[in-house]
């Protein structure tokens, strides 16, 4: 019984995460590869409107040998699979900074995506979170 419960919980978390990611993607770009746009003084690119420092923090997924970080960032941001991996990596890197806040995984993911490594602690990310929450019903 314990194993069945654990499997169910794992599947439920995966779906919640997928719903959360989809809503962030929809909020940022309509979930389309929209290229780069100026946002708060720097470029944000692709499906999740990822900035260069965010790409660096997420571990630079799919960066090729000899490729500049800027070229890899723009390419990754406009590839849904790579960009999603980047958002997941960023969440996993910084979620511990939100421990003890009582926030669910989607809230931490959304608010940190919007406000940086400690976005979960900034009131300025609440409006963004409320939009994501109304999309997915996540917590």
Swiss-Prot record:
pH dependence: Optimum pH is 4.5-5.
Pfam families given in the database record: Destabilase
GO molecular function: lysozyme activity
Top-level taxonomic group: Eukaryota
GO CC annotation terms, alphabetical: extracellular region; late endosome lumen; lysosomal lumen; recycling endosome lumen
Residues binding substrate: 51-57, 90, 113-115
Catalytic activity: Hydrolysis of (1->4)-beta-linkages between N-acetylmuramic acid and N-acetyl-D-glucosamine residues in a peptidoglycan and between N-acetyl-D-glucosamine residues in chitodextrins
Signal peptide (from-to): 1-18
Effect of a null allele: Slight reduction in brood size. 24 percent reduction in lifespan which is further reduced upon M.nematophilum CBX102 bacterial infection. Impaired food digestion characterized by the accumulation of unlysed E.coli in the intestine. Accumulation of unlysed bacteria is stronger upon M.nematophilum CBX102 infection.
Active site: 28, 39
Summary of the tissues where the protein is detected: Expressed in pharynx grinder muscle pm7, isthmus marginal cell mc2 and pharyngeal muscle cell pm5, intestinal cells and at lower levels in coelomocytes and epidermis. Expressed at low levels in intestine.
Induction: Induced in the intestine by Gram-positive bacteria M.nematophilum CBX102 and UV336 and M.luteus DMS20030 infection but not by Gram-negative bacterium P.aeruginosa PAO1 infection. Induced in the intestine, pharynx and vulva by Gram-positive bacterium S.aureus infection. Induced by Gram-positive bacterium B.subtilis. Induced by starvation.
Occurrences of domain I-type lysozyme (ranges): 19-138
Homology family: Belongs to the glycosyl hydrolase 22 family. Type-I lysozyme subfamily.
EC number(s) given by UniProt: 3.2.1.17
Protein name: Invertebrate-type lysozyme 3
Major location category of this protein: other
Keywords, comma-separated and alphabetical: Antibiotic, Antimicrobial, Bacteriolytic enzyme, Digestion, Disulfide bond, Endosome, Glycosidase, Hydrolase, Lysosome, Secreted, Signal
Biological process terms in GO annotation: antibacterial innate immune response; defense response to Gram-positive bacterium; digestion; killing of cells of another organism
Localization per record: Late endosome lumen; Recycling endosome lumen; Lysosome lumen; Secreted
Top-tier EC class: hydrolase
SUPFAM superfamilies with a match to the protein in the record: Lysozyme-like (SSF53955)
Gene3D superfamilies in the record: 1.10.530.10
Disulfide linkage: 20-106, 23-138, 25-31, 36-45, 58-86, 76-82, 98-120
Function: Has bacteriolytic activity against Gram-positive bacteria. Plays a role in defense against bacterial pathogens. Involved in pharyngeal grinder function by enabling proper lysis of ingested bacteria.
Species in which this protein is naturally found: Caenorhabditis elegans
